[in-house]
Amino acid sequence: NYLWSETFDAVMTDLPVLQDEITRHIVMTLIGNIEQNAIRDSVTKSEVTAYADTIRARQLVYRMRDPADTKTARELFQKVLRTDSASTTALSGLALTYLADFLMMWAEDRNACIPQAAHYASHALELDPADSLAHAVFGITYLWRRHYIEAMAHLDQAISLNPNHADALAGRGLVLIFTGEPESALVEFGKALSHNPFPPSWYLWGLAIAHYNTDRYVDAVQTLLRIDNPNRFHRRVLAASYAQLGDIGQAAAERDAVMAEVPNYTVNDSRRFQPYQDPQNIESFINGLLLAGFLD
């Protein structure tokens, strides 16, 4: 094992630009030191560029702050694949962009995201069965296709390959929620958050559902209030939680915000979307939505 250290002078005024500068510096330093002999013999300028593009793309997709992140990351991964169609890092990263758009509720056509994510993750695993990210993405796509055993198997494999894989741990939390084990899901989300203390909102959405399904409605509300820009999916859980707490005023406010975004929504839409193995396990959430004033 090696410990690398470096000093870096910068003005803390434009963090995105600074991040790009540090990324380029790290890429060139690592290539120059760790892979010096290989580069001398074989690495071309285009390969160095592809490596930098991959690191930048993964930085964006893991950040998951807004739809532009996954869009730019996808373009960078596709650029890498045009020069190296067998890049498993780019393939699994591309799969993650589609999964992120699905989980973050950013895609206009969410139904297309899961097949796309599964396609690229499967291709990555064909080339490299030890790709932890591909296993994690593939596992979560299996969940929304209602293949629960396969979902957990791939997520377990991802964690076996990388015990610190926060997305895989959160993915396990989702599987446990939808297979009726919310208490165990809370443990997995706790692990995920310990590895990623600045999580994408889908971690918090899943954690809130686990709290809700264990009758911890205050915890569900507090979790969702950590999300900077809640969307209709987050607000539905908020509305149901407030309603279960007897705060009908707040529940109605969240309901109205949801209906302003999707005027034709009914609680049956949630029944269809959420992949519960046992349909009875969603009924507590449905009851909360009805208490909040949503239509059946």
Place the predicted regions along the sequence by residue:
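Alpha-helical tetratricopeptide repeat
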Residues: 47-62, 92, 132, 136, ...
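Short coil/turn linking the two alpha-helices of tandem helical-hairpin repeats
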Residues: 58-67, 95, 100-107, 145-146, ...
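Alpha-helical protein-protein interaction modules
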Residues: 67, 110-111, 119-122, 136, ...
